[in-house]
From Swiss-Prot:
InterPro entries: Ribosomal_bL27, Ribosomal_bL27_CS. NCBIfam families: L27 (TIGR00062). GO terms for biological process: translation. It comes from Xanthobacter autotrophicus (strain ATCC BAA-1158 / Py2). The lineage of its organism: Bacteria, Pseudomonadati, Pseudomonadota, Alphaproteobacteria, Hyphomicrobiales. One of its GO terms (cellular component) is cytosolic large ribosomal subunit. Belongs to the bacterial ribosomal protein bL27 family. This is Large ribosomal subunit protein bL27. The keyword Lyase does not apply.
């Protein structure tokens, strides 16, 4: 009896490439307007002050400043950008 695996097994063995999602600028990092902060599917992170959201839920900076992440009482994580003027005042 010949010992050969079924010919159909060659139909397996493919996978799609990763989508490169996740945080692109972490807390404390400097950003300029238009910088992508987070790429995501759905709203794992929500836009806070000075952060916009694209149609694919990408979060991006609206002003120049520092990125901050904060979790609020509703268990949502908000991403904000503290403007440079506010940083200088602190």
């Amino acid at each position: 009896m010949a010992h050969k695996k079924a010919g159909g097994s060659s139909r397996n063995g493919r996978d799609s490439d990763g989508r490169r999602l996740g945080v692109k600028r972490f807390g404390g990092q400097d950003v300029i307007p238009g910088n992508i902060i987070v790429r995501q599917r759905g709203t794992k992170w929500h836009p806070g002050t000075n952060v916009g959201m694209g149609k694919d839920h990408t979060l991006f900076a609206l002003v120049e400043g520092k990125v901050t992440f904060q979790t609020k009482a509703n268990d949502r994580t908000y991403v904000s950008v503290l403007p440079l003027a506010a940083e200088a005042a602190e």
